[in-house]
Amino acid sequence: KLAEILMMPGKTVSVEQGMEIPVTHDIGTIRLDGDQGNSGVGIPSSRLVGCMTHERAFGADTMELGHIDYSFKPVKPVVSNECQAMEVCQQNMVIPLFYGAMPNMGLYYTPDGPFENPGDLMKLFKIDKAKESMEHAAEHLTRDTVWVMQKLFASGADGVNFDTTGAAGDGDMYGTLYAIQALRKEFSDMYIEAGMAGEMVLGMHGELEYNGVRLAGLWPHEQAPLVAKAGANVFGPVCNTNTSKTSAWNLARAVTFIKAAVGASPIPCHVNMGMGVGGIPMLETPPIDAVTRASKAMVEIAGVDGIOIGVGDPMGMPISHIMASGMTGIRAAGDLVARMEFSKNMRIGEAKEYVAKKLGVDKMDLVDEHVMRELREELDIGIITSVPGAAKGIAAKMNIEKLLGIKINSCNLFRKQIA
């Protein structure tokens, strides 16, 4: 099957009809307005414009808002600005909108943070002090992340995307798991996605545990149950790209890893597929032929419930993935299926069946633009083109609440404001 996908003659390929999945995002609008010499294309635009472009021009099923520095720690001084941006975006958008950032525990070490750098301490053979520094940093990471998301959730965010969990090793994952646990305890309706930084959790500390399981050395199929136990709705497994090997080799390895993670996970899996992970080549402008083949293989062979679109230019990442395997958001029913995955932890098949039943259509109709265009207009649940008088933003989402039998956080905020 994988060989067939790789050898298809077309430049772009796509999943078979009916196998489409919802997409989530890393890096938010930075791929549009960012210009740091990586994958951002430097278009001067507001984040509202960036988010709405993903919703209405790219056909994204979900989107996220993120700070230009894209880590939780730098958000603290400007959290009020982030909250205002979130409120404005939620008033104008229909698809689920997350707040995304990296836990990035490295920012808590000198010279950027208050704790001694474990790397420097380990070079001096001060192993116990290095471990102590990691433990303190993890505590601060948990505290800061929870505090930031308390503010953002109060401003209408649908949820949070923890991007590159474990980037600083097992301490980073430890702090993130406890942040997820705290947020789930406080906010039962918050959508929580936890995407990993790498395929294996690096044992920088080596002895940290969560729920009795040592974090160091965990692989994707072992990470998934812990992320679910902490309280996440969706897990984002990773398989690293080996830049010394071919795309075919990397994709075969990635599909093998992710298929095992999907099988072991009690919650939906949105495989991370930015440049350098998930069988995607390490290039700022990811080749479209490689991206669409990887996208198709992850859906049809690994059986993922969704794809987390990562770093890469707009053409090479969101547009290519959505064309290959996405549900095209409010062009069809992608946002509705995504909401069921996040609000009820439904796997892709169950989510599609639930939404199709609520709409009174066949599952194949969920990605039929003609059927869904008429149905969305009739039900007033938000349409991709601008029609005077049609429900938009909060109004459309209130109708979605009634249709799906769920509560949407931005609608709850609006109801409180007019009470």
UniProtKB/Swiss-Prot annotation:
Keyword Chaperone: no
Enzyme Commission (EC) number: 2.1.1.249
UniProtKB keywords: Methanogenesis, Methyltransferase, Pyrrolysine, Transferase
EC class of the enzyme, as a word: transferase
GO MF entries: dimethylamine methyltransferase activity
Pathway linked to the protein: One-carbon metabolism; methanogenesis from dimethylamine
One example of a Gene Ontology biological process annotation: methylation
InterPro entries: Dimeth_MeTrfase_MtbB
Function: Catalyzes the transfer of a methyl group from dimethylamine to the corrinoid cofactor of MtbC. No evidence for expression of this protein has been found after growth under presumably inducing conditions.
Name of this protein: Dimethylamine methyltransferase MtbB3
Catalytic activity: Co(I)-[dimethylamine-specific corrinoid protein] + dimethylamine + H(+) = methyl-Co(III)-[dimethylamine-specific corrinoid protein] + methylamine
Organism: Methanosarcina barkeri
Keyword field contains Secreted: no
UniProt family annotation: Belongs to the dimethylamine methyltransferase family.
Xref: NCBIfam families: dimeth_PyL
